[in-house]
């Protein structure tokens, strides 16, 4: 476990195996930081995040999605995206970055193209994953 320059606690670092059915590449917690901003072009993982508190935004293409406490979202691999914390009320979020054929098939089967956002409390699931 370590902290990076974005004030994120990295709790798991996996290995990239392009032939794997399912891989957890990275998992962690982003703590409140009004300057937090991530830009990903052709994102190389599937991103799953849960907003524990605060607010932020996600830009995909020409659309902006605002997220807040109690929201879950996932981003498809290969998209260009920007996500950032609110200046006034920066978020804390838990996240996991996944890859593999199984994740790709789930996105395809459930038509989860590009970005899926839902107001659903999945914090206990993220806590359980992070505790493993």
Regions found by a protein language model. Give the residues of each.
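Amphipathic, well-ordered alpha-helical segments in soluble domains
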Residues: 23-26, 47-50, 99-102, 122-128
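Amphipathic alpha-helical segments enriched in hydrophobic/aromatic residues interleaved with Lys/Arg
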Residues: 105-132
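Ligand-binding loop in jelly-roll beta-barrel domains
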Residues: 78-102
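A generic short alpha-helical patch detector that favors 3-5-residue windows
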Residues: 19, 95-98, 118-122
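Secondary-structure boundary/capping motif
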Residues: 55-58, 73, 93, 126
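Generic protein-terminus/edge-of-domain signal
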Residues: 1-66, 71, 87, 112-114
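Conserved metal-binding segment of the jelly-roll/cupin
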Residues: 67-81
């Amino acid at each position: 476990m370590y902290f990076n320059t974005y004030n994120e606690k990295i709790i798991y670092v996996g290995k990239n195996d392009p032939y794997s059915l399912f891989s957890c590449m990275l998992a962690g917690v982003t703590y409140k930081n009004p300057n937090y901003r991530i830009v990903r072009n052709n994102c190389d993982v599937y991103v799953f995040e849960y907003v524990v508190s605060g607010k932020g935004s996600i830009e995909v293409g020409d659309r902006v999605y605002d997220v807040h406490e109690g929201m879950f979202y996932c981003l498809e691999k290969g998209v260009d995206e920007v996500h950032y914390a609110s200046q006034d009320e920066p978020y804390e979020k838990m996240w996991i970055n996944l890859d593999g054929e199984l994740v790709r098939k789930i996105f395809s089967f459930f038509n989860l193209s590009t970005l899926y956002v839902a107001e659903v409390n999945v914090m206990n699931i993220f806590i359980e994953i992070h505790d493993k």
